[in-house]
């Protein structure tokens, strides 16, 4: 059985070991590739300060690239009796290279190692989330342009209120994603700082070159203060979780709208038949399960920041094992959000809209404000116009040609989709993912 990195002469009670390891072996599979990348940067730095020879570095890099490839193929496993990904990688290197494999932990603690793994994993996942958001954004903008002249009711208090349009509806969610991406970008910038070299949270007596590992891994900067680097555990995950929750909030609201508008009582949109499910008893049913599940999953994601805060709340500075539990709720959250984004993108691209909603006379009164404004433009004081139209409605005399004349920025007749698209493009460029991508390729010896 593999020896633990911290093992001494006393054997730990097996029940205690099982409880303390928990789901770490399962969760650390998310981090395997990133742990290897971090080790590659670390040993390159160790060679530069004389703690490894060039030959030892070459041997280690060869084996680490092989381990990385196995993780890419989904073949990397954490063996029974091995606590975590860090221990597994070191064990594999020691088996292959003997004492040389035991040198990779010099100047490093599992504390800064897992901090690094989490940051490398998280920034990669943020990039994938951003790509998925961008795809949904473009679908929404296309649909907004396609249906910009199709009117629909706007609601306040779930009562018919004023004319809206599908151009506004699709475009509103597109612009919401821009603000969500700004939040995600801020979380990315806080995440994209190098904690490596902080060791257990108090640095090392080795002359570590932290700037070198920062550059090798493509970080924007580093967490300078080693105590703060460790304090960032839990804080980074919480900040990112807030960004994910913000995105999830937008998708949840869109899913609610789609479910409601798809119902026969509204009949504003129609989901593709292949995207609905049936009933075991009612043969006519076409249920929007995909959006109901999206809504539930996104609502669950919105609880993620609170879960993380409750785990990390009231911890003093320094490392505590409580932080391990955050991985269980944090690491899987990215895939859940990406799944929701993918499904929403697909269905929003295929959804059909009812182009004759306002032909129904029950929506006539949504044009009341249009009539008030017409009278005001003709010179009648607004309050008098408001009163006249109200009395006409009560008397059953109200009529309108069901035309709207909105021209200001962001209105039915002037959606400003080009401006919204430009905002999204600038936001995407602000992430600057190229630096991290190129650094990782260089470490792996890939073009």
Swiss-Prot record:
One Gene Ontology term from the biological process aspect of the record: L-arginine biosynthetic process
Pfam families found in the cross-reference section: Lyase_1
Cell compartments where the protein resides: Cytoplasm
PROSITE patterns documented for this protein: FUMARATE_LYASES
GO-annotated cellular components: cytosol
Protein keywords: Amino-acid biosynthesis, Arginine biosynthesis, Cytoplasm, Lyase
EC number: 4.3.2.1
Annotated InterPro entries: Argininosuccinate_lyase, Fumarase/histidase_N, Fumarate_lyase_CS, Fumarate_lyase_fam, Fumarate_lyase_N, L-Aspartase-like
Single GO MF annotation: argininosuccinate lyase activity
Reactions it catalyzes: 2-(N(omega)-L-arginino)succinate = fumarate + L-arginine
Main EC class the enzyme belongs to: lyase
Pathway membership, UniProt: Amino-acid biosynthesis; L-arginine biosynthesis; L-arginine from L-ornithine and carbamoyl phosphate: step 3/3
Domain of life assignment: Bacteria
Family of this protein: Belongs to the lyase 1 family. Argininosuccinate lyase subfamily.
Name of protein: Argininosuccinate lyase
Organism: Bacteroides fragilis (strain YCH46)
């Amino acid at each position: 059985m593999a020896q633990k990195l911290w093992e001494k002469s006393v054997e730990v009670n097996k029940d205690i070991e099982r409880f303390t390891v928990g789901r770490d072996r399962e969760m650390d599979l998310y981090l395997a590739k990133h742990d290897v990348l971090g080790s590659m940067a670390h040993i390159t730095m160790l060679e530069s300060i004389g703690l490894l020879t060039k030959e030892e570095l070459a041997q280690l890099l060869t084996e680490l690239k092989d381990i990385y490839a196995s993780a890419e193929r989904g073949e990397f496993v954490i063996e029974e009796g091995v606590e975590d990904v860090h221990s597994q990688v070191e064990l594999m290197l020691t088996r292959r290279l003997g004492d040389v494999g035991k040198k990779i932990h010099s100047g490093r603690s599992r504390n800064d190692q897992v901090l690094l793994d989490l940051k490398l994993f998280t920034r990669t996942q943020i990039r994938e989330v951003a790509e998925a958001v961008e795809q949904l954004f473009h679908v929404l903008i296309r649909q907004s342009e396609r249906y910009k002249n199709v009117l629909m009711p706007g609601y306040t208090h779930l009562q018919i209120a004023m004319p809206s349009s599908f151009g506004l509806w699709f475009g509103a969610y597109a612009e919401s994603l821009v603000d969500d991406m700004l939040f995600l970008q801020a979380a990315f910038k806080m995440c994209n700082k190098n904690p490596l070299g902080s060791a257990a949270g108090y640095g090392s007596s080795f002359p570590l070159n932290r700037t070198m590992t920062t550059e090798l891994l493509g970080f924007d900067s580093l967490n300078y203060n080693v105590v703060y680097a460790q304090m960032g555990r839990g804080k980074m995950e919480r900040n990112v979780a807030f960004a994910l929750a913000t995105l999830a909030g937008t998708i949840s609201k869109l899913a609610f709208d789609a479910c409601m508008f798809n119902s026969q009582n509204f009949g504003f949109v129609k989901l593709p038949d292949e995207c609905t499910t049936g009933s075991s008893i009612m043969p006519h049913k076409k249920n929007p399960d995909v959006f109901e599940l999206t809504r539930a999953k996104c609502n669950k994601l919105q609880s993620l920041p609170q879960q993380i805060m409750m785990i990390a709340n009231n911890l003093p500075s320094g490392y505590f094992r409580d932080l391990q539990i955050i991985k269980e709720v944090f690491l899987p959250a990215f895939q859940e959000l990406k799944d929701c984004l993918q499904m929403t993108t697909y269905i929003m691209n295929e959804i059909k809209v009812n182009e004759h909603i306002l032909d129904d006379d029950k929506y006539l009164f949504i044009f009341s404000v249009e009539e008030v404004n017409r009278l005001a433009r003709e010179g009648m004081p607004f309050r008098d116009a408001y009163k006249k139209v109200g009395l006409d409605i009560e008397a059953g005399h109200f009529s309108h040609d069901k035309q709207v004349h909105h021209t200001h920025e962001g209105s039915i007749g002037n959606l400003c989709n080009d401006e919204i698209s430009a905002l999204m493009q600038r936001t995407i460029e602000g992430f600057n993912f190229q630096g991290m991508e190129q650094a990782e390729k260089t470490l792996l010896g890939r073009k």
